[in-house]
A protein has these predicted regions:
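N-terminal cap/lid segment of alpha/beta-hydrolase-fold proteins
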Residues: 1-26
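The alpha/beta-hydrolase serine catalytic core
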Residues: 5, 13-16, 103, 112, ...
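Short beta-strand element of the alpha/beta-hydrolase
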Residues: 28-36
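The serine-hydrolase catalytic nucleophile loop
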Residues: 37-50, 65
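Catalytic nucleophile-loop/oxyanion-hole region of alpha/beta-hydrolase
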Residues: 41-42, 68-99
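Conserved alpha/beta-hydrolase
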Residues: 50-72
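Alpha/beta-hydrolase fold nucleophile elbow
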Residues: 96-108
Length: 149
């Protein structure tokens, strides 16, 4: 396995920090991993899951959402929709520089974000969530933000 630091522009124009875990040989597939609320790409579980997937030939890019970890931008100006948009920008980066992802993985609020983004990322064949709301609308319902972005 090898690991590369990468950067790409996010939905609000900030530079987002990412790490691409690659298998030793040509990847069979690419995946995007979305971390939990206020976590980051280097969270232990995200790192272990990403590296384990490389053993099965899956390259995984995990990144810090706008304003978190090594990414630029102001976290105070972000919201659920901007996280979903950051995922779409991550997809565009992977498609332009490597290969389109076919798998989305999300933990907690990142899981809700991948569920919301899946229809905007054209080649997705599978979505995996870990401890996530079953639908993005659950986040809004619980917070009282139903009907808002």
């Amino acid at each position: 396995m090898r690991s590369e630091k990468v950067e790409f522009s996010g939905s609000q124009g900030a530079v987002l920090a990412a790490r691409l875990e690659l298998p030793e040989y040509e990847p069979r597939a690419y995946a995007l991993f979305a971390h939990c609320f206020t976590c980051g790409k280097d969270q232990v579980a995200a790192t272990r899951i990403s590296r384990a997937l490389t053993e099965f030939g899956i390259a995984v890019m995990r990144f810090d959402f706008t304003g978190l970890g090594g990414s630029g931008g102001d976290f105070g100006n972000t919201h659920f929709s901007s996280n979903v948009d950051d995922l779409v920008f991550a997809d565009e980066y992977l498609r332009a520089h490597f290969e389109a992802p076919t798998l989305l993985i999300g933990h907690s609020l990142g899981g809700a974000a991948v569920l919301a983004a899946r229809h905007r990322i054209p080649r997705i064949r599978a979505v995996a969530t870990i401890a996530a709301p079953s639908a993005p609308t659950m986040c809004c319902t619980c917070s009282g933000a139903t009907g808002r972005r």
